[in-house]
Amino acid sequence: MMFELVLFLSVYLFSIGIYGLITSRNMVRALICLELILNSINLNLVTFSDLFDSRQLKGDIFAIFVIALAAAEAAIGLSILSSIHRNRKSTRINQSNLLNN
């Protein structure tokens, strides 16, 4: 019963993240939705690791690597966002075409 609830929560988080990533026009919102997607993947990794082999922590260790990757992605994304905001005075995705100066 708990397994199904966790998978339902993970699918729900993933769907919200995909919907937000597709429909968002703000870069900060897109980064937050990407973090939601990565967190739902982590939830799946830990759940399936516990379900199939509870003695080994392969899914948990891999989830820690994904969390570190998400932190690096957030730091790089926010620094790029800060640079674009400083130059363009906007954080909207459709106004940040850097190829047209």
From Swiss-Prot:
Coiled coil: none annotated. GO terms for cellular component: chloroplast thylakoid membrane; NADH dehydrogenase complex. Its main location: plastid. The chain crosses the membrane at residues 2-22, 32-52, 61-81. Gene3D superfamilies: 1.10.287.3510. It comes from the Eukaryota. InterPro entries: NADH_UbQ_OxRdtase_chain4L/K, NUOK/Mnh_C1-like. GO terms for molecular function: oxidoreductase activity, acting on NAD(P)H, quinone or similar compound as acceptor; quinone binding. It catalyses: a plastoquinone + NADH + (n+1) H(+)(in) = a plastoquinol + NAD(+) + n H(+)(out); a plastoquinone + NADPH + (n+1) H(+)(in) = a plastoquinol + NADP(+) + n H(+)(out). Its EC number is 7.1.1.-. Pfam families: Oxidored_q2 (PF00420). It is a multi-pass membrane protein. GO terms for biological process: ATP synthesis coupled electron transport; photosynthesis, light reaction. It is an enzyme of class 7 (translocase). It is found in: Plastid, Chloroplast thylakoid membrane. Keywords: Chloroplast, Membrane, NAD, NADP, Plastid, Plastoquinone, Quinone, Thylakoid, Translocase, Transmembrane, Transmembrane helix, Transport. Belongs to the complex I subunit 4L family. NDH shuttles electrons from NAD(P)H:plastoquinone, via FMN and iron-sulfur (Fe-S) centers, to quinones in the photosynthetic chain and possibly in a chloroplast respiratory chain. The immediate electron acceptor for the enzyme in this species is believed to be plastoquinone. Couples the redox reaction to proton translocation, and thus conserves the redox energy in a proton gradient. NDH is composed of at least 16 different subunits, 5 of which are encoded in the nucleus. This is NAD(P)H-quinone oxidoreductase subunit 4L, chloroplastic. The lineage of its organism: Eukaryota, Viridiplantae, Streptophyta, Embryophyta, Tracheophyta.
